[in-house]
Amino acid sequence: MLNKLSRLLDEAGISLTDHQKNQLIAYVDMLHKWNKAYNLTSVRDPNEMLVRHILDSIVMAPHLQGERFIDVGTGPGLPGIPLSIVRPESHFTLLDSLGKRVRFLRQVQHELKLENITPVQSRVEEFPSEPPFDGVISRAFASLDDMLSWCRHLPGENGRFYALKGQLPEEEIASLPAAFSVESVVKLRVPQLEGERHLVVIKPNKI
């Protein structure tokens, strides 16, 4: 599996240390093992997880600005755990409302010795925003409108929302609330992944 990960990283133009690669592999191993009992993801094949979960998460890393991030609706830690491995200088709060997912995240934190994540069980609209975050990240979480409605209290003054999407959600972008605007749309390339991937970066409008 390490050889496959190395090939995928080369194709994506991403350079990681051997330690980071081993951490990503260990995370996939844990996800595969726990998935049998906890049903954390519909992806069953570890090699497929490398593409659809690991690479699909870390290709957004170069586009994140800041040091403090919150991954809302993180599920089994996607994209937060892969991002925390490739960006050890940043801190990621991993938020999910389901206890079984948060238990898995805490076990990953323990076994991989990840000191830059904080797993939290909470509904996003009930989670306090102090201190505010530099970035709010979502992957397969909700529509842009719902994401902004539920998470608008989380970013700081210069914070951003980062929504990982498949096809470009043109209708969702067109119907953004007036208090927000799209800063950029990045077309992401994920090796061996079928279909399009886009990162929509949204900023609150200054009043």
From Swiss-Prot:
GO terms for molecular function: rRNA (guanine-N7-)-methyltransferase activity. S-adenosyl-L-methionine binds at G73, L78, V124, E125, R139. It comes from the Bacteria. GO terms for cellular component: cytosol. It catalyses: guanosine(527) in 16S rRNA + S-adenosyl-L-methionine = N(7)-methylguanosine(527) in 16S rRNA + S-adenosyl-L-homocysteine. It is found in: Cytoplasm. SUPFAM superfamilies: S-adenosyl-L-methionine-dependent methyltransferases. Its EC number is 2.1.1.170. It holds the Pfam family GidB. Keywords: Cytoplasm, Methyltransferase, rRNA processing, S-adenosyl-L-methionine, Transferase. PANTHER family: S-ADENOSYL-L-METHIONINE-DEPENDENT METHYLTRANSFERASES SUPERFAMILY PROTEIN. Belongs to the methyltransferase superfamily. RNA methyltransferase RsmG family. This is Ribosomal RNA small subunit methyltransferase G. It comes from Citrobacter koseri (strain ATCC BAA-895 / CDC 4225-83 / SGSC4696).
